[in-house]
Amino acid sequence: MEESGSGYEGKWEKRWHPLRREWIVYAAHRNNRPWDFDIKEMVHNAPVFDPKCYLCPGNTRVSGEQNPQYPDVFIFENDHPVVGLHSPSISDQEKFSHERFYRREKAEGIAKVVCYDPRHNVTLTDLDTASIAKVFMALREEMIFFRNHPSIKSVLIFENKGEIVGVSNPHPHCQIYATDFVFNVVQKELHAMRLHQEETGRNIFADIIAAEKKDEIRIIAENESAIAFIPFFARFAYETYIFPKKPHQSLITMNDEELAGLADVYRTVTRKFDANFKSVFPYILAFDQAPVDGGDYGG
C-alpha cells in the first residue's frame, strides 16, 4: 500500500557502516517520541575529597594498599581485575564440552585504573586542555609498556561516566584492559580496513574524515590536528568520533602536540554536550586502537 503524501516519506532508511560492514537502520521520526529522563539526576554534586572513596589520595583501597598523595594522574593495577597474568590453567580436557560445542580458555592480561585528578568532584571535561593532554600522555606510556609485554596482544582503554551508565564511583577515572586476545570489534574493523585498502588503495579512516569534512554538517569540533563529528553511519544518538587527522595505529605514535590537539577537541565536544543538556553529560568513552601484537596495521 502506497503512503504517498502521508508524511512518512524519508522517515526510514538504512545506512552502510563501513567499519562494521553492516546496515544501520534510521527512523528519524522516533526523535519525537516521549523522553521521561530527569535531567536533574545528572547534576554533579560530590565533595572535593571523599574519605570513603578508594580512589581519593591517601585513602586505603580494598587491597590494603594506600594511595599516595598524587598531584595529577595516578595509575595502579585494578584491585578487582577482570583479567590477570596468573589465571588458573585449563587442561586440554577441560577446554571443550558438549561435543566441543562449548569452549573455554584462560583469560590472561593486566587491568589498570587511571585516576585523572586527585579531586573527587571533577570530570575529565572540567580539566584544562594541558591537564587532559597529560592524561593522554600517561595513557600513551601505558600503551608503550603493553606493546613491549610478551603476554599482551590488545589494549582497551575506556571510561564510563555517569551513574546512569553504571558508574559506581564518580571519582574521575578510566580503566585499561590489556588482554592476550584481540576483541572481535577490533578484528572486524581491521578486516574492513584491509578490504577498503585493497579495493580503493586508500585508508578507510582518512576517507571517513574526508567525507565528513565535505558534508560539514555533522562536525562538532576541529583544530589543526584533530576533528570530532557524529558520523553519517552513527549507531546511537550523539555517538561521536574523535580522530587525529594524521593516520596513527594507536596513541603510541602520536606526538605531544597531536595529543594536545586531541585533548582540545575532546574538551570542546564534551563541554558542548554538558552545555546542551545543562548537566554533566554521561557517556561511554573508548579508545579505538590497533593491537599491540607486532602486526602491520597500516596506520
Regions found by a protein language model. Give the residues of each.
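Active-site microenvironments that recognize anionic phosphate/pyrophosphate groups
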Residues: 1-171, 177-251, 257, 270-273, ...
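Acidic, glycine-rich loop-and-strand cores that form catalytic or ligand-binding grooves
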Residues: 264
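Detector for conserved single-position "signature" residues within domains
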Residues: 277
